[in-house]
Amino acid sequence: MEEGERSPLLSQETAGQKPLSVHRPPTSGCLGPVPREDQAEAWGCSCCPPETKHQALSGTPKKGPAPSLSPGSSCVKYLIFLSNFPFSLLGLLALAIGLWGLAVKGSLGSDLGGPLPTDPMLGLALGGLVVSAASLAGCLGALCENTCLLRGFSGGILAFLVLEAVAGALVVALWGPLQDSLEHTLRVAIAHYQDDPDLRFLLDQVQLGLRCCGAASYQDWQQNLYFNCSSPGVQACSLPASCCIDPREDGASVNDQCGFGVLRLDADAAQRVVYLEGCGPPLRRWLRANLAASGGYAIAVVLLQGAELLLAARLLGALAARSGAAYGPGAHGEDRAGPQSPSPGAPPAAKPARG
């Protein structure tokens, strides 16, 4: 058949029909490739706004803005942000102080693997990092309504609660052995008094606060290489200034030599200058006296974390309900659409038989 004969047939077949158009995949306003639906909806971690993400996945046009949260859910959202913001600042401050302390000790040539089981500055830095990370996740997750960050925040709070429960159970079960190990810990700190500036600061604060000297008695300082009477240095047979009854000696600054030569004196002469009682018994008495207050603080922290966990769960539920209401079945007009006219090429529908 010639070309001229085929043209009328083609025009008759296509008469009354809309011209065919090439189907193009839907695009979104977000940068990067369109995410898979199962990956994008799994954790709510997409960088796109919810309505834009759903348009990119389904190809449906935008019908309107996403519904806003209810007043109660909005209150929960800002309550999570405001309650975590101070902890974020405190965590970042602790992290900065810990890193600064580690940098100073490194510049002084100090060994980070010192006599303490964990370096105080390293513990401060790690604690600040964990607290600031969890608090910032709660702040940003609530403020930006990001379910991924809110789930991470909830997981962190839950991990804190589990660790605190385990630590509390261990303290209750091992309370007696922990008290018995105090004097041993103090003797280790005395032997390494000059090795670590943080250790020296902590031991000085314990002796000044409890008005004591040594572990069991002031003679425990004989275990220190610098204060031992056999030492050739100028500190031989001496005690640190934190053992002195009046370290300032009515002056403006601490007299570091107030305890020099005290270990050569008898007990009657030494008690006029330094404290003779060790820090083990006063430390045990202090722990027993403050046990109720420490337990109250621990319970308050646990209750606060439990409240944060419940608020995060409430906000996650509200966000999930809003997403389901906005993008569930019938939200885009599929179920609300009226009857559609049949296509020109479709066969006519059969009429019901009359009785």
UniProtKB/Swiss-Prot annotation:
It comes from the Eukaryota. Gene3D superfamilies: Tetraspanin. One of its GO terms (biological process) is establishment of protein localization to organelle. Pfam families: Tetraspanin. This is Tetraspanin-10. Keywords: Cell membrane, Disulfide bond, Glycoprotein, Membrane, Transmembrane, Transmembrane helix. Residues 100-120, 176-355 are extracellular.
